[in-house]
């Protein structure tokens, strides 16, 4: 959801030529799967466009060099990421909610089924992140 929420925020400000935004998983369990149907419904409910052909891929060590930021939704993903990208000398790796000044993980709808709370967390953090990047 975060990829498409952030893309929508960037697009709404006419900044899409200045950003390349892509999501990737730290684990292999969802590789090749499309966006989870309840996440699609939540994005649709908020009018957020998404790529219907998007499938999950795993982050790679090369992604560290390709991207300016690598943002994890929660501390567990951050721990798993360290197996793939053990060092962060350029301070690129951050927790999503830290951009909103909140010291907690994004609410995980996998366990709660509450995609609306997750949407709100991600949207709040993405708004703050975009503000920081364009300031």
Residue ranges and their predicted role:
Residues 1-2, 49-51, 72-76, 86:
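A short linear-motif detector with a strong N-terminal bias
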Residues 1-66, 131-135:
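Conserved active-site segments centered on acidic
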Residues 63, 69, 75-135:
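Phosphate-binding/catalytic loops
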């Amino acid at each position: 959801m975060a990829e498409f929420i952030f893309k929508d925020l960037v697009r709404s400000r006419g900044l899409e030529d200045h950003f390349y935004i892509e999501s990737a998983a730290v684990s292999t369990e969802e590789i090749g799967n499309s966006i989870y149907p309840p996440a699609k419904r939540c994005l649709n409910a908020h009018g957020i466009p998404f790529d219907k052909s998007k499938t999950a891929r795993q982050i790679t060590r090369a992604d560290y060099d390709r991207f300016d930021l690598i943002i994890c939704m929660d501390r567990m993903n951050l721990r798993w990421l360290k197996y793939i990208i053990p060092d962060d000398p350029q301070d690129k790796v951050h927790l999503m909610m830290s951009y909103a000044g909140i010291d907690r993980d994004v609410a995980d709808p996998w366990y709660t089924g509450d995609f609306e709370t997750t949407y709100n967390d991600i949207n709040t953090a993405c708004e703050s992140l975009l503000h920081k990047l364009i300031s």
